[in-house]
Each structure stands twice: as structure tokens, then as C-alpha cells.
Amino acid sequence: MKKYIFDVDGTLTPSRKMIAFDFLPFFYEFIQSNDVYLVTGSDREKTYEQVTPGIYNACKRVYNCSGSDVYEGDVNVYRDTWELPKKVERFLRCELDFSLFPLRNGKHIEKRPGNVNFSILGRGGDINF
């Protein structure tokens, strides 16, 4: 059986959005006859929202958080235990405090298994101003 690896954001779905409803039946059928793997920078909860639990659990394996949190269906088969060092977190907060970028919206430091997402604007921020 052939193996297929798909990125989620910007490939299967528009970035941070849900998969197209009319694409779901085709993709689910495709998963049933192929070994399908998903790879995403997002966490499991966000990926569930984007591709639906049915698609998520039908995949052979899903690599969340850039491969730092891995699932086979509902079973967590790997999770990186790395944590953001306090010194690095302080540095990021200083960068945020001293940035001249005027807009602030949303979460600036998002800790995930095995990595961290940092944004001056903030997660959930709107760049269309």
C-alpha cells in the first residue's frame, strides 16, 4: 500500500481553517484505501477542529506540533517532554516588551509539546488593519 503524507494548514485546509465540507467524503474514502499520515504545527485539538475527528482518527498516524506529539487514532504514541527554559521565556517577553510593532492581539507565547510558538502580534491577531 502506498503511503501519503499531507500537511494540514495551507494544503488540506486553508490556514487555521476547517477542511472543505465537499472534500470530506473523497478524502475519507482515500484514507480507507491508502496509508495516510498528517503533519502539522498545530496541536491535536486544533487539528481535530480542522480535519474532523473522523478524518483524524482514520489516518495511520498524525504528527502534531511538528512531530513532537504523535497520535495513532486516540492513542498518544510519542510526546516530546521538552519545556521552554525560563531564561528563554524571559528573553521572549523582553522582545515583546521592546518591540516597536504597535499592534498586540491574542496570545504571544504558546507552549506546545516539544516547541514554542512566539508572535509579537499575538496568536489570533488580525493583520488586516
Predicted feature locations:
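Active-site phosphate-binding/coordination module
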Residues: K17-H108
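Short glycine-rich anion-binding loops that position phosphate/pyrophosphate groups of nucleotides
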Residues: T11, S68, R123
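Asp-based phosphoryl-transfer active-site loop
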Residues: K2-I19, L38
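Conserved acidic, metal-coordinating active-site core of Asp-based
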Residues: P102-F129
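Residues embedded in well-ordered beta-strands
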Residues: K3-I5, R61, D69, N117
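Short amphipathic alpha-helical segments, especially helix-boundary/capping motifs
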Residues: M1-Y4, D22-P25, S119-I127
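Generic low-polarity alpha-helical segments
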Residues: K2, V88-E95, F118-L121
